[in-house]
């Protein structure tokens, strides 16, 4: 199995070298595709020095297009037969890779989500973000007749072939609901595993806002009845 890790990046000067080191230390990765989404804080200078070393491939967006656009760019460039999405902000711990990959390696699932709500150790998160995550997951379960615990998780791992015939349009944080909706409509098996989680707050650079939840609701409804 060849694992491609896709890391969308926007203004992560303080964390990018740390997360790359943590990913490399897993010794599970064939390639690391870093998509810089128009960073303005010096992140690009760091990436320029790392490109082509230790499995790192850097792709640059000339302007900020959004997380979803960066993930889609990474997916198109990946050569592995299993793809894993890794945020650059240190909220998600690559030491969970082994557990995330196990259901795929054992043939139990084509898609694995790392759930922040299944009991592993985690730093206390912001209350209203937790409520929004729970409500969006509940809404997903109603619309798509499933029993997920964490639709909005950043840790999504999947076999490359599930992308065959799937067109993704999301440019922003609506990637999570669009991807989930299209996976569930195609009846792929999703396996959830518990992960550790160390959430940032806005002072530390957290980018997602509560208004993104309203866009997620619309995305879930839209793709329930189209495509």
Give names to the regions the model predicted:
Residues 36-45, 90:
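A conserved acidic beta->alpha catalytic loop
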Residues 14-18, 41-50:
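Acidic helix N-cap motif at the loop->helix transition within catalytic regions
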Residues 30-33, 44-77:
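Conserved donor nucleotide-binding strand/loop of the catalytic core
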Residues 20, 24, 29-39, 59-61:
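Short beta-strand/loop segment that forms part of the nucleotide-sugar
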Residues 63-77, 82, 94-173, 199-221, ...:
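Acceptor/aglycone-binding surface of glycosyltransferases and processive sugar-polymer synthases
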